[in-house]
Amino acid sequence: MKSKIVFLVCIMFFIVACEKEQIPLEKPIEAPAPFSNDEKPEEKPEGTTEGQPEEKPEQQPEIQATLEKLSIAQLPHKTFYTLGEELNLNGFQLTGLYSDGKEYPVTVSPEHISGFSSEAPAEHLELTVNIEERQVNFIIQVAPVRVREGVLTEVLKGYSEITLPPNVTAIAPQVFQGNRQIAKVIMNEGLTSIGERAFFNSSIQEVVFPSTLKQLGQDIFYYCNQLKRADLSHTQITRLTSGIFVYADVEEVLLPSTLQSIEVQALMKTGKLKSVVIPQNVKYIGQEAFRESGIINVQLPNGISTIVDRAFYYCPNLTEVSTYGPVSDNAPDAMIQAYCFVGCPNLSRLEIPRSIRILGQGLITGNQKVNKLTIPSRVVRINFSAFDNTGVKEVIVEAVTPPATPEGEWYGFPKTVTSILVPAQAVEAYKTARGWNKFAEKIAARP
């Protein structure tokens, strides 16, 4: 018992001694203290490795001198604006002359510019740059047009000449419709399309078309009675669209080599138009395309495949239709449809394109001046009364096989025809063929 009491007393003395000296049994792990601003390690940029010196960006030296004068080293790239556009200072470079006699580049931002507004058109709008109580001026232009996402959507009236800005890719429909002040429009390179009725019933006299133009809407120059000339020859259009020049007073229309079709009534009632060369790649001429036009002569390509009915109906001044170019044999149904040249009393020469295979009825009904006619070798069918009631006297048929005729009575040529000359080896075939046998006594071999 005595030994237990001694042991407990010893333990109590040991605990009291430890508390006085604060001796920890195990030292705690301290959390690292946060870095101060001066002690933070520098972050290494990507791409650097340990031991390589870091490249620091060059900084402009702080200029202690006073700015005395501003000069424009380079104007902004954009000095031509349209209605509603925001200020664009890209490319603008200013130089400052300082009191130490040295020049330094000066940074400029929109806050330094006064006088800018694109809410109204301005031929010469002066803008002022204000920096450290020094000023310099430059001029911009605000055109009387509005452009949205590359589309010309509005043109203010009261201007006789408009130059489109370089960012226009399309002209919206009816933009110039009814504008009786406009005389000239210069279209920008980069423009690819013009919407329908864009110049309908306007006073436009001249249009400069870009080489990038590819698409035309319908009725673009309908009722433009002051337009004298349309040069589309260097464009990329493939279709001359319906009604594009109806009632326009164009005297000359130049078409591009890319053109493939002339649509319905494209040049109808163009009374002052004198001459047209149809480009070699054109395969299609639509219904009444040249109806009541003033053309005197027309050249058709030998590769054409379709001339729709009444294409040249009632062209009273038309005297000559000639052909040119290589022959295309790609259209087995290539045809000149009915009544194409009816109402052309002065027509004295008619050449049929050598690609044609079918001749429609009544092609030159009523004409008395076409006396000689050659039917090309590819023609395989001649329809009812194709050349009846005309002044045709001499016919040359190149095909060895007689072209087919409709069943029943055939009035392919007038009763007054004097000779039908065919290949020598085919004379008998023609004399006995249906329809042709009616003219047997006038059929003879070509010399």
Q: What does each model-identified segment do?
A:
Residues K78, K102-F138:
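Serine/threonine-rich, repeat-prone extracellular segments and beta-strand-based repeat modules
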Residues F80, L156-A170, R180-S193, S202-Q215, ...:
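Structural signature of tandem-repeat unit edges
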Residues M1-V16:
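Sec-dependent bacterial lipoprotein signal peptides
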Residues I15-T66, R134-A143, V147:
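Bacterial Sec-dependent N-terminal signal peptides
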Residues T66-Y104:
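Solvent-exposed, low-complexity, repeat-rich "mucin-like" stalks and linkers
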Residues P173-V175, G195-A198, G217-I220, T241-I244, ...:
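Consensus positions within tandem repeat domains that build extended binding/scaffold surfaces
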Residues S36-K40, S71-T82, V151-E161, G325-S328:
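Short, solvent-exposed loop/edge segments of extracellular or virion-exposed proteins
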